[in-house]
Amino acid sequence: MSHLHHPGCGCAAQLSRRGLFGLGFASAITAAFPALAQYAKYEAMLVNCIDPRVATGSFTYMAAHGYKDLYSHFVIAGGPIGAVAPAFADWHKAFWDNLAITVQLHSIKRVVGLTHRDCGAAFVAYGEALRTDKALETAKQSEALRQFRAGIAQRQPKLGVDTGIMALDGTVEVVA
């Protein structure tokens, strides 16, 4: 199948003299100031669950807290639960190693750890009773978030940590 281009076709726009000059200028600036081509200075790392029901809420939460496009993202079943629960012990090293390299490469200052309501990984880690007992669900997730916070304080003491439990509507209950 062929595609014929006409002069106004946007898929293969011709580069004008002005466009060529802009491209050359951008290249010259990058060559003159290589730091501009390096990593951006990220502020945080978001650690949350693989559940697609919380993806949009997580992005919205980070943007609302001033982190839009300023954070790295570690996604694992259960989020912080996956990093600390004994049921997922085989995963722990992967998370802590990833946090260390994120600090090294991105110079982050903070970790945001979000669990969420009705989390299958939380049920695996702490029992099916969490499905029907919201108080128990809150207690177990809060305990996991405090363990997560303590683990970060031990391994990366310069980092700040924010933790919370996200409802499926995107609202977050802060856990200190």
Name these PLM-found stretches:
Residues 2-3, 69-132, 137:
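Short HxH-centered metal-ligating active-site micro-motif
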Residues 105-106, 148-161:
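A structural motif corresponding to the C-terminal end of an alpha-helix
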Residues 4-27:
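N-terminal secretory signal peptides and thylakoid transit peptides that target proteins
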Residues 139-149:
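Short, flexible loop segments at boundaries between secondary-structure elements
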Residues 4-10, 154, 160-176:
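MPN/JAMM (Mov34/JAB) isopeptidase/deubiquitinase module and associated MPN-bearing subunits/adaptors
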Residues 23-24, 38-92, 166-172:
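Short, conserved "active-site rim" segments that organize catalytic pockets and cofactor/ligand binding
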Residues 36-40, 65-66, 104, 154-156:
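Solvent-exposed alpha-helices and their adjacent loops that cap or buttress functional pockets
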